[in-house]
Amino acid sequence: MLIFFNKYLHINLNILSYIPYRAIFSLLTSFFINLYIGPYFIYYFKKLQKYQIIRNNGPKTHYSKKNTPTMGGIFIIFSILFSTILYCNLSNIYIWYVISILIGYGLIGFIDDYKKIKYKNSQGLKLKWKYFFLSIIAFIFICMIKINNKDIISTELIIPFCIKNDFEINYLYVFLSYFVLVGTSNAVNLTDGLDGLAIMPVIFLTCGLTLISLFSDNINISHYLHVHYVKNSTELAILCMAIVGSGLGFLWFNSYPAKVFMGDVGSLALGGSLGAIAILLHQELLLIIMGGIFVFETISVILQIISFKIRKKRIFQMAPVHHHYEVKGILEPLIIVRFWIVSLILLLISLISLKVC
């Protein structure tokens, strides 16, 4: 929006023409918005008794969290949208693709959270309907980018740590994009089980995507680093920084002991947005490395279900795996910080892959 005012109202703020400055302003704006509205949101939702529903078969240590308000993802989404609309060039179609996922998946998460609170159970929206709506939005997103944008119509798959790192997969790319969107959103959702556990890996992952979006817009740098050239992808860096700032602002209140949880409205929206950005940048497989914590959590749930159905035995004492460590007696803050450390290491490994061959 500021770009529009600067151009057509002749304000002549040259600083707005530089991506790094707009990215920094975007981060700071979303961060301070969350710092400002966070306490009001927490107070209001406590007053309305919009508390996190604790499942009966969960860790006993979680019973102390039952009076913690949830749906903090609402102010995460708000601050991201505000900063994005304020600082991004809104004529860039990539921005609207990600915003559509942010809002669409956030709405599904909101309905899920609302049903949990209203009926006071941890089930929320039925699983089949949840995946149905997530899938519908995912396929609409994929169709839109295929129809409207030739720059990302390529169906080449970029494989990290590979000398010949681009492979044509044709129509399989549609299914890959679908699994990236739906899978990432649910992976973040599964990871969001401890105070601050999910948001910091989200921040790390987003920082990685920020760098790639900057590299991808330069044909020489993208060729040198073996990343897909995506024209005008630098605007995504500003959106990414809005996510980082919002995440840091949310972590201010979500760090142990948490004063608010993001709920499904936040986890589905953030996960879906990261998946969408990775698809636009053709970094679907690198996303798996960057978001290895989310992958690990998801695999732990899948293995637990398969093992119990086939062997009638559990691999983990409780899934997702962060609950397994809780049941073993490891303190929650210790689990959280160790997961953060692993997430940071995975980010660094993923960045090394850009020029390893």
UniProtKB/Swiss-Prot annotation:
Q: What is its EC number?
A: 2.7.8.13
> Where are the bilayer-spanning segments?
23-43, 70-90, 91-111, 127-147, 171-191, 196-216, 236-256, 260-280, 286-306, 334-354
Q: Which UniProt keywords apply?
A: Cell cycle, Cell division, Cell inner membrane, Cell membrane, Cell shape, Cell wall biogenesis/degradation, Magnesium, Membrane, Metal-binding, Peptidoglycan synthesis, Transferase, Transmembrane, Transmembrane helix
Database matches in PANTHER family: PHOSPHO-N-ACETYLMURAMOYL-PENTAPEPTIDE-TRANSFERASE, PHOSPHO-N-ACETYLMURAMOYL-PENTAPEPTIDE-TRANSFERASE HOMOLOG
Output the Gene Ontology cellular-component terms. Answer: plasma membrane
Cofactors: Mg(2+)
Q: What is the lineage of its organism?
A: Bacteria, Pseudomonadati, Pseudomonadota, Gammaproteobacteria, Enterobacterales
Q: Which family does it belong to?
A: Belongs to the glycosyltransferase 4 family. MraY subfamily.
Q: Cellular location of this protein?
A: Cell inner membrane
Keyword Cell inner membrane tagged: yes
GO MF entry, a single one? phospho-N-acetylmuramoyl-pentapeptide-transferase activity
The answer to whether the entry has keyword Transferase is yes
Pathway(s) of this molecule:
Cell wall biogenesis; peptidoglycan biosynthesis
The chemistry this enzyme catalyses reads: UDP-N-acetyl-alpha-D-muramoyl-L-alanyl-gamma-D-glutamyl-meso-2,6-diaminopimeloyl-D-alanyl-D-alanine + di-trans,octa-cis-undecaprenyl phosphate = di-trans,octa-cis-undecaprenyl diphospho-N-acetyl-alpha-D-muramoyl-L-alanyl-D-glutamyl-meso-2,6-diaminopimeloyl-D-alanyl-D-alanine + UMP
Q: What is this protein called?
A: Phospho-N-acetylmuramoyl-pentapeptide-transferase
- Per its UniProt record, what CDD domains does this chain match? GT_MraY
Question: How does it sit in the bilayer?
Answer: Multi-pass membrane protein
Q: What does this protein do?
A: Catalyzes the initial step of the lipid cycle reactions in the biosynthesis of the cell wall peptidoglycan: transfers peptidoglycan precursor phospho-MurNAc-pentapeptide from UDP-MurNAc-pentapeptide onto the lipid carrier undecaprenyl phosphate, yielding undecaprenyl-pyrophosphoryl-MurNAc-pentapeptide, known as lipid I.
Q: Which gene encodes it?
A: mraY
NCBIfam families in UniProt: mraY
**Top-rank lineage group of the source organism:** Bacteria
Query: Which HAMAP family does UniProt cross-reference here?
Result: MraY (MF_00038)
* Primary localization class, coarse: membrane
